C-alpha cells in the first residue's frame, strides 16, 4: 500500500506508534477486565477515558506531521527525489547519545507524571478536596457530614460510586461548580441535586441491602418542654425495622417499601418530593397493582401523565443520610439530654428557642445575639441565679452557639428550613407524605397513618411518672401537652415545624 511521502517524518511516526500502543493497551485491558475482573472499580476510567485520549492525540499527530512536512515533500517530488523513511543510525555517537537521553528521559517523566496523576486523582476523591477547596460554599455540607453516621464513608463513595461513567459525570458537573464558585453564580442555599444523584441501589446497597434481616430496634427519645422547669418527656419506641418471611415472601416492617417482592412507584408535583399526589403499589409475586391518589390534592390525568414515574428507593425516606440539618428543638434537646446544658437551669429550653428563631445575617451576629438574649433573660427573670450559676449560664450560651454553628449557616442560607428530613414525621411531613389517611384507591382502601404500622410505643411519660405497655398491647400515644384529639387529625409538622 503506497503512502504519501509527507508521512515519512518523525512527528507522524511518533503519533502512529502512540496510537497503536494505546489501542493495543485498551484491547488488552478490556479483555483482562471482562474475563478476569482485572483492575478494580476504576479500570473503566482508563479503558474509556485516559487511554483513548492518548490514542486520539497520537492520531492527531499523524496529519500534523504530514502538514508540517508537506511543502518539503512536494519540492522533493518535483525534483525527482525519492523521500525515504527517517533512519536512526545508532553507529553515530551523537544519535546514540540523543536516543539514550530520550528513552531514559521519557521513562523517567512517565514515572513522575504517573505518580503525580495518581496522587492528583486520589486528592480529587478525598473528603478534604470536596469539603475544603470551596470552604465557604461547601461549609454546610462539610460540617454536617462530620456530624453524621456516615462520617467514615468518603464523599465519592455515594456521590460518584464505582465505574467510569459516573466519574465522568461528576467531573463534568464539577467543572461547572468550579466556574460557579469563581464567578459567584452559585445559589444560596444550594438545592439538593435530587435529579443528578446516583440511584441508591448502586451506592447504598453496597453496605445496606433489602435481603438482609434486621432485628427490631428500641429507640428512646428524650425531649424537653419550653416551660420554666424544662419538663422532660421520655418515649420508648420499638421500631419495626425487621421483616418476616411468609409463604408470600417478605412482609411487614418499615422496609416493606424496598421489599424485593414489591415495587412502589410515585409521582410528585414538587422539586423536593414533598408533595406526592399519586402512589402505585405492585406485588411482584402476584402481579396485583393498586393505585392510590390524594383526595385532598387532586391532579388531572394529563398532569399526572407528564410527571416522572419514580420507583421508591432508600433515599425517598433516608434523604439526609450524611448532611442532616437538625432543627433547633432537636439539637437543644440533645444538648440538654447529654448534660452539656444543665436541665435545671429554669427556662433554658424556652429562651433557646426564642434566640434561635430569628434569622441572622452572619454567624458572628448570631453568636452575639445568643449571648446577649440568654444573659438578658436570666438578668430579667432570674436575677438570683445570675451569680450563683454564672458558669452554667455561660456554658449554656456556648453550647447553644455550637449547636447553631453545626446546623445553621447564614452565609449560604442553609438550615433545616430548606432541607427537610423525611425520616419520621415530627418537624416535616416525612412518612405522612403518603401515610396520611388521604391517599385512597378507587375502592376506598387507604394508606393508613396508624402509628403502629412502623413502631409501637413501649413506654412514655415523665421520668417520675412513666406508663408502660404489656407484652402484647402497645400504648396509645399521649401528647405531652393536652391538645385533646387534635394529634389524631392534624399532622405533627403542622405545629412542630415551627419553633415554640
Describe each model-derived feature in a short phrase.
Residues 2-19, 49, 99-102:
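Alpha-helical transmembrane segments and their helix-start/interface "positive-inside/aromatic belt" motifs
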Residues 58, 145, 207, 317:
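Divalent metal-coordination and catalytic microenvironments
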Residues 20-33:
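Alpha-helical transmembrane segments of multi-pass membrane proteins
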Residues 34-56, 62-199, 217-306, 331-340, ...:
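Sequence context of c-type cytochrome heme-c attachment sites
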Amino acid at each position: 500500500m503506497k503512502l504519501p511521502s509527507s508521512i515519512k517524518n518523525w512527528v507522524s511516526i511518533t503519533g502512529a506508534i502512540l496510537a497503536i500502543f494505546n489501542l493495543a493497551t485498551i484491547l488488552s485491558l478490556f479483555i483482562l477486565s471482562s474475563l478476569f475482573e482485572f483492575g478494580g472499580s476504576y479500570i473503566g476510567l482508563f479503558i474509556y477515558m485516559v487511554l483513548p485520549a492518548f490514542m486520539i492525540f497520537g492520531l492527531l499527530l499523524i496529519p500534523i506531521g504530514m502538514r508540517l512536512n508537506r511543502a518539503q515533500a512536494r519540492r522533493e517530488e518535483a525534483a525527482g527525489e525519492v523521500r525515504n523513511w527517517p533512519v536512526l543510525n545508532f553507529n553515530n555517537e551523537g544519535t546514540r547519545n540523543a536516543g539514550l537521553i530520550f528513552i531514559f528521559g521519557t521513562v523517567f517523566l512517565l514515572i513522575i507524571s504517573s505518580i503525580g496523576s495518581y496522587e492528583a486523582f486520589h486528592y480529587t476523591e478525598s473528603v478534604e478536596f470536596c469539603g475544603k477547596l470551596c470552604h465557604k460554599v461547601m461549609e454546610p455540607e462539610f460540617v454536617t457530614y462530620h456530624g453524621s453516621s456516615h462520617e467514615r464513608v468518603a464523599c465519592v463513595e455515594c456521590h460518584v460510586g464505582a465505574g467510569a461513567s459516573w466519574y465522568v459525570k461528576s467531573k463534568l458537573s464539577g467543572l461547572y461548580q468550579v466556574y460557579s464558585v469563581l464567578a459567584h453564580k452559585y445559589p444560596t442555599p444550594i438545592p439538593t441535586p435530587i435529579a443528578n444523584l446516583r440511584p441508591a441501589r448502586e451506592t447504598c446497597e453496597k453496605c445496606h441491602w433489602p435481603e438482609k434481616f434486621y432485628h427490631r430496634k428500641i429507640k428512646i427519645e428524650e425531649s424537653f418542654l419550653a416551660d420554666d422547669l424544662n419538663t422532660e418527656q421520655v418515649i420508648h419506641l420499638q421500631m419495626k425495622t425487621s421483616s418476616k418471611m411468609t409463604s408470600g415472601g417478605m412482609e411487614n416492617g418499615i422496609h416493606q417499601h424496598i421489599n424485593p417482592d414489591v415495587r412502589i412507584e410515585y409521582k410528585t408535583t414538587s422539586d423536593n418530593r414533598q408533595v406526592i399526589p399519586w402512589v402505585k403499589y405492585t406485588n411482584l409475586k402476584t402481579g396485583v397493582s393498586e393505585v392510590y391518589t390524594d383526595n385532598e390534592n387532586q391532579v388531572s390525568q394529563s398532569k399526572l401523565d407528564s410527571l416522572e414515574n419514580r420507583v421508591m428507593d432508600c433515599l425517598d425516606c433516608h434523604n439526609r443520610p450524611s448532611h442532616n440539618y437538625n432543627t433547633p428543638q432537636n439539637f437543644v434537646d440533645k444538648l440538654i439530654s447529654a448534660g452539656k446544658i444543665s436541665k435545671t437551669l429554669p427556662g433554658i429550653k424556652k429562651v433557646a428557642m426564642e434566640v434561635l428563631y430569628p434569622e441572622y445575617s452572619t454567624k458572628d451576629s448570631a453568636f452575639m445575639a445568643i449571648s446577649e438574649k440568654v444573659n438578658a433573660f436570666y438578668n430579667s427573670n432570674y436575677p438570683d441565679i445570675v451569680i450563683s450559676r454564672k458558669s452554667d449560664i455561660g456554658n449554656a450560651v456556648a453550647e447553644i452557639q455550637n449547636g447553631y454553628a453545626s446546623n445553621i449557616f447564614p452565609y449560604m442560607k442553609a438550615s433545616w428550613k430548606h432541607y427537610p428530613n423525611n425520616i419520621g414525621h415530627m418537624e416535616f411531613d416525612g412518612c405522612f407524605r403518603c401515610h396520611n389517611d388521604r391517599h385512597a384507591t378507587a375502592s376506598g382502601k387507604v394508606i393508613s397513618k396508624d402509628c403502629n404500622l412502623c413502631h409501637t410505643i413501649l413506654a412514655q411519660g415523665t421520668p417520675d411518672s412513666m406508663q408502660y405497655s404489656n407484652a402484647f398491647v402497645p400504648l396509645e400515644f399521649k401528647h405531652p401537652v393536652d391538645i385533646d384529639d387534635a394529634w389524631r387529625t392534624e399532622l405533627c409538622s403542622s405545629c412542630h415545624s415551627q419553633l415554640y
